């Protein structure tokens, strides 16, 4: 594996970095003061990203994307991730990014016209409704939502929650248990029988649409709503989630990097006990630990991306990266808050926002504990070498 960046990738990285520094970061303050303006700000940022040729870095050229390799995407999304608005400005943020990949791989042409193409343009947002109050999520075998056949269609019944982006989403990919087995359905937000019960109050606030609770009650859909083949819902979920876990890591790496940069800048100008913070060995150790962990996290992401580019499965590598990156970035942000002291817990810097937003990363797309259990089982029972 060659760790150097070719000229094309390096130039693209620099363009994304300039876009984030010059255009995206200056808009953060507006959103921080009024989260209700986020969608308006994002529309303006997406327009500029399109003008700069940075939109849809994760999609193939025939769909209007940049046609990047996974390794190139890792570089781009890390740079975009230096602002919480960055990935959304490129239309490459969760859950839409993962849903785009799934629809591109599995949807038929009619479904692509109705759902994928508007999603690609940034006209609409989407949701992925898998997690349930009774446990389906980390353990998908607990799936309770049902899809009962009626005539030439299905009747969906059940409850979903923590569906990210639910408020304002145009449609949802819903996982329910049919006679053939777990099956995915495409359901419009305003479809009869689908009700957004509430937006769940959570500690993170920078995801447009929040995290919703959805009730499916007598929700009748036709066969055309089935995504892919009936009974393959769990397979499609893994098809979506393995790369999505990795792109989450790519984006959050950028947050860890920026938090550490802010801590370094502060340590170089702030004085205590007759010298700058940067001269205190304890602060030096904290900065060093963040550099060590973020560097290791980046290499894990790049390795998994390299395997994807070779056409290999990355279930094991994606789990390891998800655990390590989520925890490493969380620690880096925590150290940055500690180094900057009172300023770090204020909203005069984005650090307190980063702190709130990064903590859930250890939970969604599989809690660290579930991934550790899976990693351990594969290592023990498949004879994997460290």
Residue ranges and their predicted role:
Residues 212-237:
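A short, charged helix-loop
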Residues 96, 136, 161-167, 205, ...:
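Glycine-rich phosphate/pyrophosphate-binding beta-alpha loops
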Residues 1-87, 93, 106-111, 118-123, ...:
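Alpha-helical interface subdomain recognition
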Residues 142, 190-220:
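Flexible, small-/acidic-enriched active-site or ligand-binding loops
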Residues 144, 157-197:
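A short core secondary-structure module
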Residues 68-69, 138-141, 165-170, 207-208:
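Short glycine/proline-enriched turns and hinge-like loops at secondary-structure junctions
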Residues 135-139, 154:
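Hydrophobic, small-residue-rich alpha-helical packing segments that form membrane-like cores
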Residues 122-131:
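A short, Trp-centered hydrophobic/proline-enriched beta-strand micro-motif
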